[in-house]
From Swiss-Prot:
Cofactor annotation comment: Binds 1 Mg(2+) ion per subunit. Binds 1 thiamine pyrophosphate per subunit.
Protein name, entry field: 1-deoxy-D-xylulose-5-phosphate synthase
Cofactor(s) it depends on: Mg(2+); thiamine diphosphate
GO CC annotations on file: cytosol
Organism placement in taxonomy: Bacteria, Pseudomonadati, Chlamydiota, Chlamydiia, Chlamydiales
Catalytic activity from the UniProt record: D-glyceraldehyde 3-phosphate + pyruvate + H(+) = 1-deoxy-D-xylulose 5-phosphate + CO2
Cited HAMAP family: DXP_synth (MF_00315)
Annotated source species: Chlamydia caviae (strain ATCC VR-813 / DSM 19441 / 03DC25 / GPIC) (Chlamydophila caviae)
């Protein structure tokens, strides 16, 4: 990159600085921003392809509108990196985005006045924008929801579309269409519109008419602005009317999302229109990075130290340890062969949930419904009702959106839908909108629901296979971390498991430790550290949060009066809550120390520091255990350790 290019970005401290530059310089700025994002994400990881594709669009928005006076509402928010660079956040904090001391990977009001909402989930921007438009309808404020094409598959977006009033003014919907979702659906429409809108004779005619109208004394400018609505009506006589017009949105586009001059012109026109408008912008996801343009889904999100060079992309790399999603993807392929009518359903998360192999192997039994979590669950219920086994693969944080569907269409009907709840636990780099730490709270309350979590790869495979035979609603939750491969207790992947049966992993005398899922490893580590203090612990994997193994724990509590519970879930409504209900029901009097996620929102961070922040690191827990139970070590002459 040249020093000239570098100097442009360094001169941007706020969006108003954009006005200092020519169109040619703004194009150089886009190049610099692209280079900056690639360079930073090579070190930090993050959402790559979507941010590379929206740079020129973001520059044009900030050039025409004011993000402090007008309201920019980014749907999802993971495509806001260019927005951050233009709003005073081109700092060392940007260089550590998604990490300790760095910026959030999403819009965040705690960072900047230019960010209106904490974001992370898709489809809500239009509803939020309509609410703000209603509250500010008498002001000069422009409301600009910025949606990706995938957001238009969300039911929430369609509900919002149905509530748009033609009386709205200063309401501009920006549709960033990067060919990842609805493009095929509107392909014929877009081709007709594009052919008509960009026809030289029509554009020449339109310009002459508008120029003539502006010359009318007193009313010319007003009539000219309204002539745009007339031109849209004329186009509708010759080509299909865009669906957006049926929802009181005047359609403008398609517009090349990488042509800054054209974008600025279109936004300036839309700014002065007295009715709601949708601007359809075509962008290229991964723009400027060839490997990302060729495979935008793969490079939607990247890990730190990803290889951005196409020439070197086939260099050998160290193969990471298999994660729980990897185990899930492999296991469902095996189950797909054993169960010839097994269906897998996912709401737009096939790659993240490692379902590409199943999709390729069994294309007729793999269904990606798009960003429609509620539909995914209810669709799965329909498959189950038709007597076919079905697994609905869904992220914990997105399952929130399907709560009623789980209750009404699965549990109430008693249908054997298996919910494979991915990303259960802290989301680390993604932060508070993505932590999967609330699902137990609402799933526990639902009758007929079995809830379990594996501690190892073997137990995970056992649960997946066994659950297909339970004939009831099941939730199997698991994190996106390396799966424990060696399990001395569970060795046979084909062993059948019955609901509600826990396992003792290690015997002791002084304290009982329950670890949920992968936290069993932490519990065993704590046991070893407690041994150095002369404290002997029994470690148990309940496996099932519901039904809880009342028989096993009734026996264990006859010999233990001190209990420790460790879970990577909110302290409200998780394993500890189930255990406390058990204690109350059976009138056990024991001292319980609970380690979980405190009742607060936690921002992004590196794994070790975030675990320490919430009190789930081993060192912090051991200190608290020793203090809470007032453990002190004594060594008898026989070297036998006793606790007083």
């Amino acid at each position: 990159m040249t020093s000239q290019v570098s100097s442009i970005l360094s001169q941007i401290s706020s969006p108003t600085d954009l006005k200092k530059f020519s169109l040619a310089e703004l194009s150089l700025l886009a190049e610099q921003m692209r280079h900056k994002i690639i360079s930073v994400l090579t070190n930090t990881g993050g959402h790559l392809a979507s941010n590379l594709g929206i740079i020129e669009l973001t520059i044009a928005l900030h050039y025409v509108f004011s993000s402090t006076e007008d309201k920019f509402i980014f749907d999802v928010g993971h495509q806001a990196y260019p927005h951050k660079l233009l709003t005073g956040r081109n700092t060392e904090e940007f260089d550590r985005i998604r990490h300790d001391g760095g910026l959030s990977g999403f819009t965040s009001p705690s960072e900047s006045i230019h960010d209106l909402f904490f974001s992370g989930h898709a489809g809500n921007a239009l509803s939020l924008a309509l609410g703000m438009a209603k509250a500010t309808e008498d002001s000069r404020t422009h409301i600009l929801p910025i949606l990706g094409d995938a957001a238009f598959s969300c039911g929430l977006t369609l509900e919002a579309l149905n509530n748009i009033s033609s009386n709205l003014s200063k309401f501009i919907v920006v549709l960033n269409d990067n060919n990842m979702s609805i493009s095929q659906n509107v392909g014929v429409m877009s081709k007709n519109l594009s052919r008509w809108i960009h026809h030289p004779k029509f554009n020449l005619f339109s310009r002459k008419i508008e120029k003539w109208l502006t010359k009318i004394p007193r009313y010319g400018n007003s009539i000219s602005r309204r002539s745009h609505k007339l031109s849209i009506c004329l186009k509708s006589l010759f080509c299909p009317i865009p669906i957006f017009e049926q929802f009181n949105l005047a359609y403008m586009g398609p517009v090349d999302g990488h042509d800054i001059k054209r974008l600025i012109s279109v936004f300036q026109t839309a700014r002065d229109l007295p009715f709601p408008v949708l601007i359809h912008v075509y962008t290229t996801k991964g723009k400027g990075l060839e490997i990302a343009q060729e495979n935008p889904e793969k490079y939607h999100g990247v890990t730190a130290n990803f290889n951005s060079s196409k020439e070197n992309k086939f260099l050998p790399t160290i193969k990471p340890q298999l994660t729980y999603p990897d185990i899930f993807g492999q296991t469902v392929c095996t189950l797909g062969e054993a169960f010839p009518n097994l269906h897998i359903v996912t709401p737009a998360m096939s790659l993240g949930s490692r379902l590409e192999a199943f999709k390729e192997k069994f294309p007729n039994r793999f269904i990606d419904v798009g960003i429609a979590e509620g539909h995914a669950v209810t669709f799965s219920a329909g498959i189950a009702k038709a007597k076919s086994p079905v697994i609905c693969s869904i992220y914990s944080t997105f399952l929130h959106r399907a709560l009623d569907n789980v209750f009404h269409d699965v549990c109430l009907q008693g249908l054997p839908v298996i919910l494979a709840i991915d990303r259960a636990g802290l989301a680390y780099g993604d932060g508070c909108s993505h932590h999967g730490i609330y699902d137990l709270s609402f799933l526990r309350a639902m009758p007929n629901m079995v809830i379990c979590q594996p501690r190892s790869a073997v137990v995970f495979q056992q649960l997946l296979q066994s659950s297909l035979q339970w004939n009831m609603p099941v939730a199997i939750r698991y994190p996106n971390i390396a799966a424990t491969q060696r399990d001395p207790i569970a060795t046979d992947v084909h062993m059948h498991r019955d609901p509600g049966v826990g396992e003792i992993l290690s015997q002791g005398e002084d304290v009982l430790i329950l670890g949920l899922g992968h936290m069993c490893n932490t519990a065993l580590s704590i046991k070893l550290q407690l041994l150095t203090h002369g404290i002997s612990a029994t470690v148990v994997d309940p496996v099932f949060v519901k039904p809880f193994d009342n028989n096993l724990f009734s026996i264990l509590l006859m010999h233990h009066s001190k209990v420790i519970i460790i879970e990577e879930h909110s302290i409200r409504g998780g394993l500890a809550s189930e255990f406390n209900d058990f204690l109350a029901t059976y009138s056990f009097k024991v001292d319980v120390l609970h380690f979980g996620i405190p009742d607060a929102f936690f921002a992004h961070g590196d794994k070790e520091s975030l675990l320490k922040r919430v009190g789930l690191d081993t060192e912090s827990m051991v200190k608290r255990i020793l203090t809470h139970f007032n453990f002190r070590t004594k060594t008898s002459p026989s070297n036998k350790l006793s606790i007083v």
